[in-house]
Amino acid sequence: MNAKKILAMILALCLMLMATACGSTTPQSQIKGDLNINGQIEVGQEGVDVEVNLSDVHMDAAEAFAAGHWEALFTPVQIEGRALDMLNFDLTPTAEEKAAMEKEPAYGKPVVYMMSDGCTSGPTVADDLKYYTEAGLTADGLKGMSVVEALGTGKATVAVNHIATMLVPITNGVDMTFVGGAHIGCKTLYVLNDSQYKTTEDLKGTNISVPNGIGNTDYNITCMMLDADGINPQTDVTLMQVTADACVSAMERGEISACLLSDSFAYAMVKDGKLRAIRSLLDEDFAHNNCCVIAMNRTYVEQNPVHAKKIIQAVQKAHSFMRENTAEATQYLLDRGWNAGDFDMNVMLNGSMQFGTTDAFTQASLKQIVDNYLRLGLIQSMNNADEIMALAWRPVLD
């Protein structure tokens, strides 16, 4: 066995051990609002009403602030071929599908989905709306474990999460793969509103917080944002971990210049005049890329191709419901505690994410992300983009 393969196995083992530690974190020690146990606060602030001024036109983050119309960032960029329409799709297995399912190892066993909230709640919504049942499946939810550990060990079958969370572990040998597109957007780089930082160029030579740590989701996303603007994330800035709940205080003390936050958590502080956005995954150049994808245990997909297809059909039908009926879906999520904060804010933010992306859109965005990760050195255990795509991208819809 060559040294590269041994190193990849060691990295994968270390990642799994780290994930186990994360999964065993007690609720008392978790950051309040960190619903997905990933170091970020994904939901809005309870009991805080904010004024929402909708816009008919899209503006990128810095432009929207300069124009005094912050909400223009959340008007979706219209992209042909992005939306996958499965709202009226009949999930009932055909006779041929049913016969094939009966021959697969997963037949008669429940689908285990990662119970998640907010923008990653598609698999949970699919169960609540009985879409798995319609697809001829039974389902159980799993909580309290990282998505990488749960999918990689086969304890969970399916989940929605960030490409930035899962891509590097896949290249390090974790047994999972991407099977469909979930949504765009949801993370933005924020500074203090009264600071001197107007663009990412102004951040050179400063410290920037990536709340869930070096090498994790926020680190990878921030690297991509800075790189897109010609800023070297390894040499032009210092990326460091300050948790989401402590970022504002750290900025006020001058310890960091900026912080990557979820838009739902930051929104009330923006409206209160505390924060300002300077770069976002909703900016037009990033709106052509998925932020989050549907992932499954890779061995499960290989051994149960028809089960995998029916599972993804169910999740994508849930995503279509969330996209096409945004207000209804938002109230639905709020009623179940899967969104938090102001209703109008959540309607706008949920609408901006354009849930349920086509395989063609997802494949194109994933290929670009793989190329960027290789160039930036974020992936180190593999160096061939085609081989990475073959490992990480296994679409299951016909």
Task: Give the ranges of each region predicted by the language model.
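Bacterial signal peptide processing site
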Residues: 23-25
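Ligand-binding clefts/hinges and TM-proximal coupling segments of bilobed small-molecule sensing domains
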Residues: 85, 214-231, 236-238, 313-345, ...
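Secondary-structure end/capping motifs
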Residues: 302-380
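C-terminal motif of bacterial Sec signal peptides marking the signal peptidase cleavage site
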Residues: 17-21
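Short, glycine-/small- and polar/acidic-enriched structural segments
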Residues: 28-234, 238-241, 257-263, 274-281, ...
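C-terminal solvent-exposed extensions
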Residues: 371-398
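Pocket-lining segment of extracytoplasmic ligand-binding domains
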Residues: 73, 164, 240, 245-335
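Bacterial N-terminal signal peptides that target proteins for export
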Residues: 1-10
